[in-house]
């Protein structure tokens, strides 16, 4: 195949990031050249999100940018927004080819199809449309409570589309991340009143535990130091009677060196079984809780199955299980009817529990959810002010957590110094610590590659003029890096 330039942009969750990595891996294996999104590309692949209205606006803006970058390029759009509103995307331009989220796994086959059928001859758009028309299962929107039993080996649960392999995403190489993710669960059985991810991704399904272990062992054998266990709702992982805590134990017992990071978890599921697994040595001291509010009355309107008291108990238990773990939370501000008193309850809980990070965002009414029609609406200005207050608390909490690391010896995984570049001789290297801090490391010997676990000594100072622009930082860490000195391999 004539060298095809392909660029990728991922919007939304870690699950989307992993799925994009897998698609990029297939293109790279076929001989395509993966290029930065800002560069000219023949094919753009955009993996979208539908969690908020702003996420959809960002998706449309990104699509338009790709269309404008090169008049002959093809822009393939997939993901949750493509699932929920394919017509709005198709209307942007004839070069915007939509693959709804429930068919996303089929994009994994596009590179091989182009290699066999297109081979660089003729119009790329015509070729992609021909491939798209040959996809065997037509996409239909997922009903909120739809549940179709799967018949795929190694998968348990239900899904929106029979025969769709929701767990085909397992790249051999990672183009955009040094710490690989592993998708073990998809979909959600909760019906939170504000969320339509359950509509876009369907009911909960899980990758069978023997296959999870097999994939983790493959990552460990390839030299990966850490794997991020990823799903829409990890607390709903099921393989028969085996739940997520038992899976963690099985993975820990079945491997030798690789560490495990939990992408996110539900507060009410922080129970004795989870805590026992969390306390295991190679489970990273980091949990991100889907809190959403600290007010019992707001949580009830959200249909969240816990109270502020349960959150207090969960956080205290996490801190008892591991020394000073990184505990972050998601919060929605301006949920319909949220009063000043209710917001004060949320703010008070956050101050009391001193979270290491708060990801706060304003409520966005989503079509098809119960909250769409809830009243009274909180004015956008007030919701924004509340987000700003929580944001300030987030940064002070992160700074306090980071300051407690001064003088400590930490393990971390080195990151790439630039998209697709190891930066083996860079004066500074960046890495993500076991407790989820972005750290600038000095004195790393040349030749140590991204993805390697190293041990560092954290100093109290942050280096000036470090090349932070060379690394694509996680937004949670872009303003709170620490400085450390390389001690050796971990």
Role assignments for model-derived ranges:
Residues 338, 353-355:
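Contiguous mid-protein beta-loop-alpha structural module that forms a pocket-lining wall or clamp
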Residues 75-76, 84-85, 220-343:
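Conserved SAM/AdoMet-binding glycine-rich loop
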Residues 1-230, 235-236, 287, 309-320, ...:
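Proteins enriched for Cys/Gly/acidic motifs involved in redox and nucleic-acid/cofactor modification
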Residues 93-94, 115-117, 246-247, 278-279, ...:
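Short, hinge-like loop/turn segments at secondary-structure boundaries
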Residues 373-490:
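Terminal RNA-binding accessory module
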Residues 45, 80, 229, 262, ...:
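Residue-level signal for inorganic ion chemistry
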Residues 55-57, 203-208, 238-242, 301-304, ...:
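Short, solvent-exposed loop/turn segments at secondary-structure boundaries
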């Amino acid at each position: 195949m004539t060298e095809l330039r392909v660029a990728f942009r991922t919007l939304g969750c870690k699950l989307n990031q992993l799925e994009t990595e897998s698609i990029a891996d297939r293109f790279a294996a076929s001989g395509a050249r993966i290029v930065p999104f800002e560069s000219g590309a023949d094919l753009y692949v955009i993996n979208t999100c539908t969690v908020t209205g702003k996420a959809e606006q960002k998706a449309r803006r990104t699509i338009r940018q790709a269309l404008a970058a090169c008049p002959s390029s093809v822009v393939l759009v997939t993901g949750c927004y493509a699932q929920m509103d394919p017509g709005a995307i198709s209307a942007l331009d004839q070069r915007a080819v939509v693959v709804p989220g429930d068919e996303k796994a089929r994009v994994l086959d596009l590179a091989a199809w182009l290699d066999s059928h297109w081979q660089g001859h003729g119009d790329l758009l015509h070729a992609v449309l021909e491939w798209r028309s040959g996809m065997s299962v037509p996409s239909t929107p997922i009903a909120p409570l739809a549940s179709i039993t799967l018949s795929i080996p190694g998968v348990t649960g239900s899904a929106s589309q029979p025969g769709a392999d929701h767990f085909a995403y397992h790249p051999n190489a990672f183009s955009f991340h040094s710490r690989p993710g592993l998708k073990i669960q998809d979909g959600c059985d909760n019906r939170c009143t504000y969320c339509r991810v359950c509509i876009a991704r369907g009911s909960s399904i899980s990758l069978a535990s023997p296959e999870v272990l097999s994939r983790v062992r493959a990552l460990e054998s390839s030299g990966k130091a850490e794997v991020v266990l990823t799903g829409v709702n990890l607390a709903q992982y099921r393989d028969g009677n085996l739940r997520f805590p038992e899976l963690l134990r099985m993975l820990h017992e079945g491997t030798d060196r690789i560490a495990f990071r939990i992408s996110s978890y539900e507060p009410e599921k922080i129970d004795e079984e989870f805590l026992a697994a969390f306390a295991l040595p190679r489970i990273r001291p980091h949990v991100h809780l889907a809190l959403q509010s600290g007010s019992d009355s707001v949580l009830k309107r959200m249909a969240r199955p816990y109270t502020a008291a349960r959150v207090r108990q969960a956080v205290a238990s996490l801190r008892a299980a591991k020394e000073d773990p990184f505990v972050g939370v998601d919060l929605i501000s301006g949920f319909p009817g949220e009063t000043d008193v209710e917001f004060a309850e949320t703010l008070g809980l956050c101050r009391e529990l001193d979270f290491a990070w708060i990801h706060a965002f304003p409520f966005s009414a989503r079509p098809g959810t119960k909250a769409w029609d809830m009243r009274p609406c909180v004015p956008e200005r007030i919701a924004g002010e509340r987000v700003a207050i929580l944001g300030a608390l987030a940064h002070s909490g992160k700074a306090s957590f980071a300051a407690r690391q001064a003088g400590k010896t930490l393990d971390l995984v080195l990151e790439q110094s630039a998209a697709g570049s190891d930066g083996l001789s860079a004066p500074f290297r960046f890495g993500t610590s076991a407790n989820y801090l972005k750290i600038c490391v000095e004195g790393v010997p040349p030749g140590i590659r991204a993805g390697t676990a190293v041990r560092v000594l954290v100093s109290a100072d942050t280096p000036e003029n470090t090349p932070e622009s060379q690394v694509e930082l996680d937004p949670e860490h872009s303003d709170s890096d620490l400085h450390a000195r390389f001690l050796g391999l971990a």
